[in-house]
Amino acid sequence: MRSNCEEIVIRMKNLFRFKVTKDTGIAVIAGLVMIALSLLMIPFGGDSLRDTVISFILRDVLMIFGLGVVFVSLYVEKKSKEVIAELGFSRRKWALSLILNLAFAAGLLAVFLKDGKPADVISLKNLYGASYILVAGIFEMTFIYGFLRMSFEKAFGIIPSILLTSVFYSLHHAGFQPEFLHLFLVGLMYCGVFYITKNMLIIFPFFWGVGALWDVLVSSEAGDEIKNPVSFGIALVILFASVIWVLFRKWRRSSNVVKNIDSNLGNAQER
């Protein structure tokens, strides 16, 4: 049996460590690319067709779909299926995570509603915005709270991981919601809560959803830009493209397995 001192040492190593690897560098570069894409959006914040198209390419295509879906899925394929659990997507304590998710969401909503419900909070335009926010949330779960957090934890430990992830989370809003201190604190909250069960179901979709929807649609002027049918359409396109990409990669892996089996059988027959 381990002594109390050994247990303390192990826990401290989980909280703080220094084990920088090639994967750490990949995470930092990917995170900086995310921030750069957001910063590039600043000159294109107008309502013109050109600004809309460029913002769509920068945020929706390259950031949300490119980094959140394509990059993360290819990274997982290159490593192993076990990485999926390390990202926070597993059956580990899923029931407890879901219960806590609902409880935290209810508590947060109660705090928001203590001064009364805002007028027109339930409306078609807010539905458009909510659809876009929830789809964009998939990117935050896979890339920021998943990939970046996991990479920083492996390199520096849990505490630095929470801090670094929150910094990147805050800075990735630079081009469309520059409320850095507020969003840093939001990142601390969600990232810290994640470590209660290490399952993404403890924050997404309800707890994160309540905070994100209220923060963007009610408290921030940034929400006005997505309260329209175009944003709803973009959300559907991203969601559809993500499903197609996942199915395509799954088919590709299955096809490669069959080819390898056929190749091995052919080599065996030649012998």
Give the positions of each predicted feature:
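Aromatic-anchored segments of alpha-helical transmembrane domains
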Residues: L32-L40, A105-K114, S166-G175, W208-S219
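Function-critical hydrophobic alpha-helical transmembrane segments in multi-pass membrane proteins
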Residues: G66-V70, A119-G175, L185
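Hydrophobic alpha-helical transmembrane segments
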Residues: T24-I29, S97-I99, L127-A130, I159-L164, ...
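Functionally important transmembrane alpha-helices
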Residues: L40, F180-L236
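Alpha-helical transmembrane segments in multi-pass membrane proteins
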Residues: V20-E77, V230-L236
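Membrane-interface helix termini and inter-helical loops of multi-pass transporters
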Residues: F44-V53, V83-E86, L113-L124, V218-K227
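Membrane-interface capping segments at transmembrane-helix boundaries
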Residues: V76-V83, W245-I261
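Short, Lys/Arg-rich, polar N-terminal cytosolic tail immediately upstream
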Residues: M1-K19
